[in-house]
Amino acid sequence: MQLYDMHSHILPGIDDGAPSVEKSLVILNELKKQGVTNVCLTPHFYTNEISAEDFAAKRQHAIDRLMPQIPDGMKVVVGAEVYVTRYMFNGDDFSCACYGNSNYILTEFAYTSQFSSHTMEYFVKLTENYNMIPVLTHVERYPALINDPSIIGELKDMGVIIQTNTNSYTKKASFFSKLKLIKLIKGGYIDVIGSDAHSLTHNDPRTFTEALDFISAKCGQSTVRKMMGNAEEIFNSAL
């Protein structure tokens, strides 16, 4: 089974993740040691602060610095973690934020969001007006969703993919938080997983297999295989 990391901040010097190529390679090599050979590079794209054109240029500079040094045996896909705001929908082309050549787009919202009808309208616009498939990042950070899985169900009915972070399943993570997440996984609410790695101290990438082992122990190895299969579909569509 190939392992896929669907969310990371490894591109150098573009956001609050790796500040240099050297630090980027440290994270990539730690993932590789665990057998993670397919990695999505998804720097923050704050749509209320920077245009899509300027973001793409800034990201390209980081890509040009890192790509020649990607470790042997690793594949990477470039995308973005897009903070969704009304400024996205001003007529600009933001397809550059999708995973590679795919129409999947990693999306983030304010953690205090109640996922009201106004927020849901953003998902409608992305899916119907832009023909994109939103991937909602780190579902565990939205209390409104964790406390009311029916809203997650509404999102999934719209075709939204739900992502969770590996560090939410480690020994250091809250027992009750893990309990809620495992219930969501068993209920079919969570589709893919990512490290969200910024460094070895901020969302440590070395927790990847620990998380998969925990999920496997609680939900079965077939669940992990399904999550990786979902990730593989997105990753391959981006190549």
Mark where each language-model region is:
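An N-terminally biased module of ancient metal coordination in phosphate/nucleic-acid-related enzymes
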Residues: 1-73, 202
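Extended substrate/RNA-proximal surfaces in nucleic-acid metabolism proteins
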Residues: 50-163
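Short acidic/histidine-rich active-site segments
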Residues: 189-205
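Non-catalytic positions within long, well-ordered alpha-helices that form the structural scaffold/packing
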Residues: 29-32, 127-128, 185-186
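Mid-to-C-terminal alpha-helical segments outside catalytic/metal-binding sites
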Residues: 208-239
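Active-site neighborhood of phospho(di)ester-bond hydrolases with catalytic His/Asp-centered motifs
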Residues: 3-6, 39-42, 77-81, 135-137, ...
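Active-site environment of divalent metal-dependent phosphoester hydrolases
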Residues: 46-49, 83-85, 140-145, 169-172, ...
